[in-house]
A protein has these predicted regions:
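Preference for extracellular/luminal or secreted protein segments
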Residues: 1-52, 255, 273-360
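Glycine-rich, aromatic-flanked loop segments that form ligand/cofactor-binding clefts
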Residues: 76-101, 119-142, 162-186
């Protein structure tokens, strides 16, 4: 994207957000979910909540592209400002679209980096055909241990190998769905499954820079548009999970130069840890925004009213001063800018006259 274009989008986003109410700003930074394939229900959900994004899970995916395209159309009330419609389409173990024929990280880690570029070029195009504009698909974690739960999903077993394949994957998706790097600052160093606990490591900042940080720096340099923060703690840097850590957000912005949208991993995972301090999903969302996330993702334990409860909580936090209004404005502006870029690039919905021919 040319600098002049980026400046124009930023200016327009700032104007749009300046005209928003606090509630509209709060809604714009929430990515929600309801488990249905009913287009009318999905359309109503997006219209009533006004949220800025939706994540498609298995319960949202029908058996063919044409039906999925109808769903993503229903999720887009205003094509001029399309929501971020995301999916976890890594390939292999984590793949929502069953008709994805492209190799997963388990195979790609043993192939030249060019294979990762080809796979993610195909995958990104496949998603865009169906109206999915964000892929939570590039696992930038370094996983040398085959017994690690993230091993099969990581693109490399060494920092250099991972960095090469992450770079290739981002370049591959450049004309397809937007790229997301996950799980910053790196799941490989923190043992354990963050779906059920808060993995932790005592790795120092210097050690991280020379190892697990390398693939993220490479992916950012390659142009990844989103960065997903994991619910894992590097205790030598910050005792809090990275998703709630202002310091890790500072590192991403100031040291790695990331200028895109930061988003949490599913906040329901914090609840699933069983720790008392994370049992309130609304408080988790507010804390995540305060730490520097531009968008909060809510899937696990979510119901049809979860998004609005989170929005209400964000509004209340701004009104009480617990969440600075400027932080919410900044987050809403960054998300809105990305949505405007999607609309201008035509990456919200592309022609797909033969969708019916591709089925799972």
């Amino acid at each position: 994207m040319r600098a002049a274009d980026a400046g124009a989008f930023a200016q327009r986003a700032a104007q749009i957000v300046a005209a928003m109410s606090t509630r509209e700003r709060a809604a714009s930074v929430v990515m929600g979910h309801i488990p249905t394939t009913d287009a009318a229900s999905l359309s109503s959900y997006m219209t009533q909540t006004g949220i800025g994004g939706f994540i498609l899970m298995g319960a949202n995916i029908p058996g063919d592209e044409a039906s999925l395209r109808a769903i993503t159309t229903a999720l887009t009330p205003d094509p001029a400002l399309p929501p971020l419609i995301a999916v976890d389409q890594e390939g292999g173990d984590v793949a929502r679209l069953g008709w994805d024929p492209f190799p997963s990280a388990l195979a790609l880690k043993n192939e030249p980096a060019a294979a990762a570029q080809d796979a993610f070029a195909g995958r990104g195009a496949l998603l865009l055909r169906a109206g999915i504009n964000v892929n939570f698909g590039i696992v930038a974690d370094v996983a040398p241990d085959a017994s690690s739960f993230i091993y099969r999903r990581a693109l490399g077993t060494t920092p250099q190998a991972s960095a090469e394949r992450v770079t290739a994957a981002v370049r591959g998706e450049a004309s397809g769905a937007l790229s997301t790097l996950k799980h910053f600052p790196g799941h490989g160093a923190a043992p354990g499954d963050s779906h059920t606990l808060i993995p932790a490591t005592g790795m120092s900042k210097g050690e991280w820079e020379a190892s697990d940080g390398m693939p993220f720096r490479a992916g950012i340099d390659a142009g990844a548009e989103l960065l997903m923060f994991g619910h894992l703690a590097f205790t030598a840097v910050d005792g809090a999970p990275a998703s709630l850590s202002a310091e890790w957000h500072r590192v991403a912005r100031e040291e790695l130069g990331f200028e895109g949208v930061t988003i949490t991993d599913d906040l329901g995972m914090l609840e699933a840890s069983g720790l008392a301090e994370y049992r309130d999903p609304v408080a988790n969302a507010v804390a995540a925004l305060a730490a520097g996330n531009d968008m909060v993702l809510a899937v696990m334990f979510s119901t049809a009213d979860t998004a609005m409860r989170v929005v209400d909580g964000i509004v209340a936090a701004v009104e009480s001063g617990a969440l600075p209004a400027e932080r919410l404005e900044d987050a809403a502006t960054r998300v809105t800018e990305l949505r405007l870029e999607l609309a201008a690039a035509g990456r919200g919905m592309v022609p797909c006259g033969d969708c019916e021919a591709v089925a799972g």
